[in-house]
Amino acid sequence: MDRPKVRFKGFTDDWEKRKLGEVAEIYDGVHQTPEYQDKGIMFLSVENIATLKSQKYISEEAFEHDYKVYPQKGDILMTRIGDVGTTNVVETSEKLAFYVSLALLKPQTIDSYFLHNIMGAFEFQKGLKERTLLTAIPQKINKDEIGKIPFSITLNIDEQKKIGDYFKKLDHLITFHQRKYFKYEKYKNKLIDI
């Protein structure tokens, strides 16, 4: 079995191979472009993955008709058309609608933030690339193929949470410093323009 080289103190169990479909339910969004509204339920597609924010909305009626399953807090959205394999964890309790260019993962037996980070790791990305239709333009992965991607995980939920929390804090720290960097970069450019 697999075992990471670096571990948090107190965790010694082997990691095991699992397929994504064994630890999460996988769905895709609507296949037709909806009729947009000025307000309503936020509608996400591949270009919104970084922020999970959009200026596109659909009506409550369209949402009720088209979405039996929709993203909820703790779920993961993954790009599957064009940019394949970028993920983000849903952190809002508001209703969200999404396009077919995104896959919705509802973690069942795994911590969301742990899974989000595992999905960005080389092993998962390699498995994703092997199942991506590279000849398609734009490239894409079929929804059914996503669940077949193998990766290594700890089955210890406490270890998953500890790893997930650690990477979540690290992501927030990186974002904080990126904002500071951009602020100083903007300040520098203003000084140069004088």
What name fits each language-model region?
Residues 4, 161-173, 177-178:
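Extracellular/lumenal glycan-associated surfaces
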Residues 45-47, 56, 61-125, 137:
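A short beta-sheet element
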Residues 8, 15-17, 149-153, 167-173, ...:
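Long, compositionally biased tandem-repeat segments
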Residues 7-30:
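Non-catalytic DNA-recognition/assembly elements of restriction-modification systems
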Residues 1-13, 179-194:
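Short amphipathic coiled-coil heptad-repeat segments
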Residues 31, 95-102, 134-159:
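A short glycine-rich beta-alpha junction/loop motif
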Residues 32-50:
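Short beta-strand/loop turn elements enriched in aromatics
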